[in-house]
Amino acid sequence: MAMGAVCDPFHPDLAGKTLDIMRAVASFLGNPTQFSTKMPIGPELAKEIPRGLPVSPLVTIITLEKAGELEPKAPGPEERLKTISILRKEGLKPMLFLRPLIPGLVEDELDDLISEAKHHGAVGVVVGALRVSRPILRRLSKIGLDGPIRARLKKEPPVGGLVPVPSRDLKEMAMRVAREKGLLAFKAACCANAYVAGVPCADLCWARGFCSNCPNKCLEKLPPVEEKAVREALEKAFGLEAREVSLEGLRLLVEVRARQGMEKLLDKARRALEVATRRLVSLRVVRA
């Protein structure tokens, strides 16, 4: 479970609701739960974070020097670094969320930023690329950061659309620096969440060529796959009848009987099975 993709879960107007949700998850589900935030979290608020479920805190800091220009309305990096310290003192495993990596900025700040995060108690770093639109590029041009980004783009972003900025070298650099400083390094937030919970990554990064090679060792923690459970899940959740179920290495192969209107269900069913079984899933439709 990830909190923070749409809005900051610890914004003062939302913190109470966020804690209510986390308590409910702790009481009834126990899902590994991750949140990303830029908000200051003080000792009293940190103590309210439920301990009955694995919690992976990500604290977003992308710059120390240009925070006032890039994020004028957000709390400064000093407050966020203090949040890392407080969360660590409460027994959690906070990580620096270094996303997005901004070309032309991160190269000069990377060493200091990761050093500060470690000094304040971060156990790892999660990296991620920048995505830009035309309006974002215009805003970045006002502080002289659009040039290095445009140099990496093959063409102008489409009207109304976002495009990822190629950043493989920056990701590798950030992960290398983090490891050199004794921190864990993750290519994706889901990997950090899985590491904290001690479970295989739900996005199957280890099977899709996106593994961070962290100490979690997902392959050693894969759950057993029972044919009966697969059949029941498809029937009860999606109304699909499994004709054949087989496991070949890391891939689960399922033949499902064709029926009217099933096209919209197949992708959802495949994704649900992948999360449940932690295997790559191939669904093949067969006629009766």
Where are each of the predicted segments found?
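Conserved AdoMet/S-adenosylmethionine-binding subsite of the radical SAM
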Residues: 1-170
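C-terminal accessory extensions appended to soluble enzyme cores
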Residues: 140-288
